Amino acid sequence: DRADSLYVLTTPDTDSDGVALSVGEAVDLVEDSAIDSNYSATYWPWLQMNDTENNKYVWLPPTVEVMRNIALTDNVAFPWFAAAGLNRGTTNAVKARVKLRLDDRDTLYEGRINPMATFSDVGVVIFGNKTLQVKETALNRINVRRLLLQARKLISAVSIRLLFEQNDEVVRNQFLSLVNPILDNIRKERGLTDFRVTLDDTPESIDRNELNGRVFIKPTRSLEYISIEFNITNTGANFDDI
């Protein structure tokens, strides 16, 4: 209801008896929860972390590393970049409870669970960018949801300056002059491919002391799949003709 934050949920990786859940059982848990929201996300499996203060290893939900990487992403890039992958998704985990195979990761991702993947050279990595929204739209990606959260925050901060000014053409132009640069800067920083801001004011809305702005955006999607095709040509082939 707040519409101003992303909620990272914990998905259990053992049952009530402490028996490890399978990938399919984890997906079933999320499905049975009936959560359908682009303001929430979840990750799996749990991670073994080194508790240096007590000199022991402990199992923790991946939430702790996810939040760290979200903060890292905000510091080294922008909220509309995915907090995932080898650049912004590496963790401090000793190991994951389950070492996921490729088909395991695919099953989890299709089930709206972001996998904690294990790679021999870098360790455990956040390898997903999905929200818990069921419908396939731009908003079932975390970076797009966080883009909108940031844009709303920035636009709200400048729009409040106009409250109690005269509701006329001058204030409408001021609104556009404040909002357009914000979105243009996001576009320059690779968060949007295009945008448009319009004002939809009617005599009735003016009489209600309202200014109605509409923001249309084309968010930049994250790259999640790379397809590489190799072609063998004859020795005498001219690449310019291909």
Describe each PLM feature range.
Residues 1-242:
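Structured, hydrophobic secondary-structure cores that serve as assembly/anchoring elements
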